[in-house]
């Protein structure tokens, strides 16, 4: 609100006239009002929420900036004394808030009602002394009230700091106690370590103690061995079969036994070959006993002129029953790569160490040959050992009887006339080109053959896969029995 003008402008001029000195507002009150009413000074001093008092928010800033600007000094205590002489009182004890009935916001004309306390002219000397004493008392009253509050606040802060100090001292004592406990434990550990070192030194100097300790360790080891080597006892049938197979081998040799194809599987394969009308199998069906493998050089080796450098194919070759070992010696040298036109399944075949074959590390990973572990580092195959012993008697009736006795424990597949095999021989297999044609033919001819007969090859592969799965099921069932 705008203040009421204290002077009335004259009708002859536009400028206001100078107010008369009689009944004028004291300069202190006028300057104080302008200072409080200025919006630029609200951060330091401003009106209160009720607009009936003013608050000094920052006394240091008020003394440093505003007092020199309006009153030519920077003494805040002198300003408080001046307020006291004009009847101002402190409203809030926690802050510098002063009020007067004639000091209101927007009503500057009421400043005329504020009168300074001063003595009369008759008793001027006495009243002056009284005024001085009263003014000093009033100033002390206002200042004393603020200082007491400040002292109380400082006392409260001191109490808080003392409590924090006590808490920190308690934590320090607890930490010192923990450090002492840790130091004691460290000393105990050092003493134990010294005792152990002295004990070990004495033990090393005493040979009887060392002998006793070694003997005790040996006794403890002997006690632990029987318990650690306990195994589950096998059934009677499995023990008899295993005893018969291992008794024919060398003594104190650890072998991994894997049965080869038996007579029933050979007869089944003969019948399978006899049922085929392919010219490829006619030469084999004429001699049912002639079956197995021969080495065929790969196309890469043939092109390079070094047919013995690499073997990647498999062919059918004839051999007599007396040449089992010579046939098996050729197996590790051949890498049985899968040819797209050869739908044969080759069983795993071992090798006898007496034939001087290559070591197991040089064999192709496509073979799952029978491995062995012996004390002397030699390889031993129980099946090949049986064949070695019965090679001289293979033709005589006594040799055949001995072979039958040795193979009694081996599980056998169903017989030739079993109706189970009839489902595999109801469909004739398609003709397959000879090995010579495969080697001499180019890749284009092979692709042409595959394009001409895709359905027959697919049906042939499905039949062979199904036959292989059924043979695996039969072998697993025979082992369970």
Swiss-Prot record:
Pfam families: HSF_DNA-bind
UniProt DNA-binding region: 25-119
GO biological process, one term: response to heat
Biased composition (Polar residues): 213-227
Biased composition (Basic and acidic residues): 234-243
Post-translational modification: Exhibits temperature-dependent phosphorylation.
Free-text comment on this protein's domains from its UniProt entry: The hydrophobic-rich region (HR-A/B) corresponds to the oligomerization domain. AHA motif is a transcriptional activator element.
Function: Transcriptional activator that specifically binds DNA sequence 5'-AGAAnnTTCT-3' known as heat shock promoter elements (HSE).
Cited PANTHER family: HEAT SHOCK TRANSCRIPTION FACTOR (PTHR10015), HEAT STRESS TRANSCRIPTION FACTOR A-1B (PTHR10015:SF458)
Name of the protein described by the UniProt record: Heat stress transcription factor A-1b
Source species taxonomy: Eukaryota, Viridiplantae, Streptophyta, Embryophyta, Tracheophyta
């Amino acid at each position: 609100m705008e203040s009421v003008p204290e002077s009335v402008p004259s009708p002859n001029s536009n400028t206001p006239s100078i107010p008369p000195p009689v009944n004028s507002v004291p300069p202190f009150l006028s300057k104080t009002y302008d200072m409080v009413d200025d919006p630029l000074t609200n951060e330091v001093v401003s009106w209160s929420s009720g607009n009936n008092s003013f608050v000094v928010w920052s006394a240091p800033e008020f003394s440093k900036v505003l007092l020199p600007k309006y009153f030519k000094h920077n003494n805040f205590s002198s300003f408080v004394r001046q307020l006291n002489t004009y009847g101002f009182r402190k409203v809030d004890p926690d802050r510098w808030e002063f009020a007067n009935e004639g000091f209101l916001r927007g009503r500057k004309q009421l400043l005329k009602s504020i009168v300074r306390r001063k003595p009369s002219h008759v008793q001027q000397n006495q009243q002056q002394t009284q005024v001085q004493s009263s003014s000093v008392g009033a100033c002390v009253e206002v200042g004393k009230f603020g200082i007491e509050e400040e002292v109380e606040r400082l006392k409260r802060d001191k109490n808080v700091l003392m409590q924090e100090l006590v808490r920190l001292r308690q934590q320090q004592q607890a930490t010192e106690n923990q450090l002492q406990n840790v130091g004691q434990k460290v000393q105990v550990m050092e003493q134990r370590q010294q005792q152990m070192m002295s004990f070990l030194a004495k033990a090393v100097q005493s040979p009887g103690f060392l002998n006793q300790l070694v003997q005790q360790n040996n006794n403890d080891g002997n006690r632990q061995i029987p318990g650690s080597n306990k195994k589950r006892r096998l059934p009677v049938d499995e023990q008899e079969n295993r005893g018969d197979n291992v008794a024919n081998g060398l003594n104190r040799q650890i072998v991994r036994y894997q049965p080869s194809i038996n007579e029933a599987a050979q007869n089944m394969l003969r019948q399978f070959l006899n049922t085929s009308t392919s010219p490829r199998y006619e030469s084999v069906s004429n001699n049912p006993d002639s079956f197995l493998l021969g080495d065929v050089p790969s196309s890469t080796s043939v092109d390079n002129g070094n047919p013995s450098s690499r073997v990647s194919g498999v062919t059918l070759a004839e051999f007599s029953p007396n040449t089992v070992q010579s046939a098996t010696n050729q197996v590790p040298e051949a890498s049985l790569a899968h040819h797209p036109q050869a739908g044969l399944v080759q069983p795993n075949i071992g090798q006898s160490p007496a034939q001087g074959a290559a070591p197991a590390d040089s064999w192709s990973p496509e073979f799952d040959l029978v491995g062995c572990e012996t004390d002397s580092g030699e390889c031993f195959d129980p099946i090949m050992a049986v064949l070695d012993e019965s090679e001289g008697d293979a033709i005589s009736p006594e040799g055949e009887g001995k072979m039958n006795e040795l193979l009694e424990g081996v599980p056998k597949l169903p017989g030739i006339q079993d109706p189970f095999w009839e489902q595999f021989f109801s469909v004739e297999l398609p003709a397959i080109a000879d090995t010579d044609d495969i080697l001499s033919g180019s890749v284009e001819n092979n692709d042409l053959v595959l394009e001409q007969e895709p359905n027959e090859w697919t049906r042939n592969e499905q039949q062979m896969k199904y036959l292989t799965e059924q043979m695996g099921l039969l072998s697993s069932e025979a082992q369970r029995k």
